[in-house]
Every structure is written in structure tokens, then in C-alpha cells.
Amino acid sequence: MQVVRESGVGYYVGDLAAGRAEETRVAGESPGVWVGGGSGVLDQRGEVDPVVFHQVLAGRDPLDDRPLRASRGDRSVAGVDLVFCAPKSVSVLHLLAPRELADAAGAAHQAAVADAVGYIERVAHGVRRRQAGVAHRVAATGVVAAGFVHRTSRALDPHLHTHLVMANVAQGVEGTWSATDTRRLFLHRRAIGSVYEASLRHELTSRTGIAWEPVTTTRANTVITSGRVPSIRWDVAGIDPVLLRLFSQRAASIDEFVHRRGGGRPSAGLRRTAFHIDRPDKDQGQTVDGLRSAWKSRAADFGIDPADLIRLVGRVRDAPPHAAVDNDLLAARLEHLATKRSWLAGRDVVAAVADASPSGLPAPVVERVAHTLGTAVAEHDGRALAQLTQLAQSPQPTLSRVSAQEPRWVAADVVRTVRSQFDPLVSSLDRIGGDSAVAERARAPVPRADRAHERAERARWDRLGPRTLDR
């Protein structure tokens, strides 16, 4: 996620006026389409017009050119770019697999981005209004955004990703336009990415029946049996690792860049820095069709026939059955977070639930599972339960979830609930949130063995005092 200035808008639409066919784009790739409820309010649908895109990012109404937000000249933020990147295995399917499977991978990616946009609009998008000298978050009519699908990396490897460029304008539900409140968006950026990836797994499995496997990275040292998982990533099961490494030149160049400058094992921060410093321009003279032929030839040099990728279809039927949410993975991920902070916010739980779903879940289901977990924790935490009640019974009808304090819980409480009570809640998604028997299981007494640790954590929480996430 990065800020977009008006001077950078041309990256997304700069080559559209040339009239290049969509299948031949490399640097600019797709012409882009308008997405989000706010775009509809501005009567912007379908393919992006470059002139209108510049106008909207400049904070002006494309219908009558009136200003939609205050302008601070060159200091104004035009928008925010959220990049949704498919795993390398999905990129390979989309650009090298036989047509039917390739199209399914592309459609699954598009559907997952749309699902993530829905999550943003429900949870992480809004505006700020001042009432009686007090600033409030107010719900908005939806995001004003354009999605640009790109299919190559800067090293010209298969790399399916979408730039979701959200304009820094939004209409509050009371009808007034202004700049957006991006603070909640930045707080939720980890959850947004996890929701996208879970939705992608769900969509692609539903369409093709492929199976998934967790990715163990050297940097993260992800070992499930250790009890703590720094990160959870998934790739399509059954793809030759050689094929994935063959088309990961950009990642390899970043690691080499860090190594040349005396870095050891490249951390996420070092990799981000290297990404921006060691960033080549895309070759405008290449076509996707030409690159696809070159990719297939390169794979053939290593004895790999991309046509064999079709055998991945339907593998989920042969895989051992698994829970919709892996309880051990969920607990391990939350335990890792608990080593870094004494409390967990709702967005942390959403991200963990999404990451721990082997075959993925739609965003609304991820939210429902996370809410079920939060409710189970709140049953044993009067403060958290009061927060949930306050959110549900806000006296101001214009305020939505984005306008109130996000609920949060003692991290140890969340981990304990997952370990001791949550397994029956996630074993059958059909029962989550709708079965009174399951709700009763969530209200089970806290094991006495955990009481001393619970009291210590709660005392630590009380010393911190009540704070909103704005601070």
C-alpha cells in the first residue's frame, strides 16, 4: 500500500491513449475499470477514461468539475494504491496453463479483489466529521477506485496482480464529499491482504477443484510444531517448485541486491527498501503473447511442459478432508502475535482466520468466524462485551463500524479461547453464528489452570488504560 501523488497518476493510464490492444500491454497492461460504490455515485462505471481518472484523482467531480475535497496543492494526496498480488503458483496457472484453467485463475483473482473491496467498504473506509468539537468517523457511500490488472513483474516474469487505486475522495452518508479517512485503511492493510488471499483460494478451488499447501519460508522459519507461526502463505499444491523458482527472477534480484550490500538474511523491511531502489522499468516493446511463448520455451528447457498443469484440476477431491479453518494454524498464528503485544484488535483476528483457512473462505464468512471468536472471548471479558454492545447500540445512526472504537481483547484470552473452545465453532461453518448449541459451547467456563495467567495479563491491560485505535 502506498500513497499516490498527482504526479504519479500517469503510471496507471499513461499509455491508454495510444490505443494498444489489451492483450499486447506490458507496462500499462489493462486499461482498468471503475469499482466501488463511490464510483457509482459519481456515475463512473466500466472502463476507465484517462481524462476522468486524472480529474477524480485531483479531487474534482467529473460531471461538473466542482471540488470534492480541499486541495493543498502539490502536498495533496491524490489517492492510495493497494496492490493485490496472486501467489506465484496462481500467476503461473493464469499465464502458462491451458486456456480453461488459465481463465479460471484470472476470474478467481478478479472475484477475490472484488471481495476485498467489499471488506474495505464494510470495515475500513469512511470519512471524518466534527460534531460539537469532537471528531467522529462516519460511514461513506463506498470507495471511489479503479482497478488495473497487470500480469508481469518488472523482470517480465508471470506476476498476476491488481493495482486498486482509491481516490482520496468519499461521500459521507449525510451527503457531503471530502477527503477520506485513510487511518483505518492503513490499520487494516494486513487484514485486507489476507482476506483477498483467502477469497482467491476459495474462488479457485470452487472453480477448478485444485488443492493448496502451506508455504514454508526460510526467513520466517515457519514450523507448525513450534507452536508459533510468524506468517502463513499458501500455494497451489502439485506445481513443480523448479517452475516457480524459474519465474521468480524479481524476488531473486531483490535478495541479491540486499546480499551485495552486506545484508544477511533479508528481512521484510530490507526487501521493501530494495524493491524501490532496485526497480527496473518495464519493457514497453514486449507483448504478453510474445512473453508467454518465451516462458513456455524456458520451461521446456528444464523439462517442464506447462500443458501438464491441467492435472491439478480436481486434486482437492483426492486430498484428505480438512476443517474450513485449521484450528492449530489459527492458534499458532495468534500465539505469535501474542508474543509481540498484550492485546489483539478485530482486524488481527480477521487476518489470522483468513490465513488459517486451507481452501479459503469468502470475506463475509471470514468476518463471521472472527466475530464468533470475538464474541466467545467477550463472554469472559466484561470490558470487551461492553464494547461490542456499544458498537451495536450506537445512538447516532450515521455512525457505522468505521466510526466507532474497534473492539480488542487481551491476546492471551483470544489464544486460550481458540485452544480450548473454538474448535467446535469452526468445524462446521454452517453452524457458526446460527446454532444456539454452538453459542453455548462458546460460553463454557474458563479452565482454572489459566486463571493466574489471565489475571496477570488483565492487570497489564488495565495499566495501559482505555485507548482508541486513533492514537
Language-model region placement:
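Intrinsically disordered, flexible peripheral segments
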Residues: 1-332, 337-338, 345-354, 367-371, ...
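Intrinsically disordered, low-complexity regions enriched in polar/acidic and amide residues
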Residues: 1, 386-389, 420
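Short, amphipathic alpha-helical interaction segments positioned at domain boundaries
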Residues: 388-403
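Short, positively charged loop/turn segments that connect secondary-structure elements
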Residues: 357-366
